[in-house]
C-alpha cells in the first residue's frame, strides 16, 4: 500500500507529526499516517529554492511516496518532528531530499485541507521558506524522481493547463508564492 519497505520510506511513515490548532498552537502529536488518514491538522513545511535567474527548483515526487507519487511540487515538503521547529526541519529536510544546503528565509504560512488520494487527507498548517542557490541538487531517489527549473510565469501557465501534474499544496499556495517571491527578490537585491 505504501510502496516498498525501503528503510527511508518505512521510517518516514512511522514518524510522528505535531498536531496544531487553527492558530498553530501545539495540541499534541500523532503517528504520521494516522494523522493523514484521520485528517488531523498538523504542522508542515514547504521549501521553495530559486536560482539567480529567478527560476523555481521543482521536484517530481518519487512514484513510491505514500501519496502524490509522480507529481511535481516545490523543492522540498515535509513535517517537523515533535520538539523540532519548522526552520530546523526545513534545514534538515532540504539536504535529505535534494542534497542542497542554502540560507532559508521564512516567507509565509497557510492552512489547507485536501483529500490527496483515497484515504489520505492533507490538513496542514504549512510554513513556507525561500532560498536562493545556483548549486544543482542531488536528489535522494526515495524522495524525488527528477527535478527541473521553471520561471514562475511558465509554471503558472502549466499549473492552469496541467493541474493533475502538480501537488494540491503547490496549486493552493502558488499565488501567494508569486507575490511573496517579488518581496523576497527585492530584499535580496537591496542586500547586494
What label would you give each PLM region?
Residues 39, 53, 63, 95-136:
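Active-site segment of metal-dependent pyrophosphate-handling enzymes
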Residues 2-3, 31-33, 70, 111-192:
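Nudix hydrolase/Nudix homology domain
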Residues 44-76:
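A glycine-rich, hydrophobic loop/mini-helix early in the fold
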Residues 1-9:
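N-terminal amphipathic/basic-hydrophobic helices that include classical n-h-c signal peptides
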Residues 57-58, 73-107, 129:
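The catalytic Nudix box helix
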Residues 8-46, 52:
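Acidic, metal-coordinating catalytic segment for phosphate/diphosphate chemistry
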Amino acid at each position: 500500500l505504501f510502496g516498498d519497505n525501503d528503510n527511508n520510506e518505512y521510517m518516514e511513515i512511522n514518524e510522528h507529526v505535531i498536531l496544531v490548532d487553527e492558530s498553530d498552537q501545539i495540541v499534541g502529536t500523532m503517528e504520521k499516517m494516522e494523522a493523514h488518514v484521520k485528517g488531523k491538522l498538523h504542522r508542515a513545511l514547504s521549501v521553495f529554492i530559486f536560482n539567480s535567474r529567478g527560476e523555481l527548483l521543482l521536484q517530481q515526487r518519487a512514484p513510491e511516496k505514500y501519496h502524490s507519487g509522480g507529481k511535481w511540487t516545490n523543492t522540498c515538503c515535509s513535517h517537523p518532528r515533535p520538539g523540532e521547529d519548522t526552520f530546523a526541519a526545513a534545514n534538515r529536510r532540504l539536504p535529505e531530499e535534494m542534497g542542497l544546503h542554502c540560507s532559508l528565509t521564512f516567507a509565509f504560512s497557510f492552512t489547507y485541507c485536501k483529500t490527496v488520494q483515497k484515504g489520505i487527507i492533507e490538513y496542514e498548517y504549512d510554513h513556507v521558506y525561500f532560498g536562493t542557490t545556483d548549486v544543482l541538487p542531488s536528489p535522494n531517489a526515495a524522495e524525488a524522481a527528477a527535478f527541473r527549473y521553471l520561471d514562475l510565469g511558465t509554471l503558472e501557465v502549466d499549473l492552469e493547463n496541467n493541474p493533475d501534474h502538480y501537488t494540491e499544496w503547490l496549486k493552493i499556495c502558488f499565488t501567494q508564492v508569486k507575490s511573496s517571491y517579488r518581496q523576497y527578490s527585492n530584499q535580496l537585491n537591496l542586500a547586494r
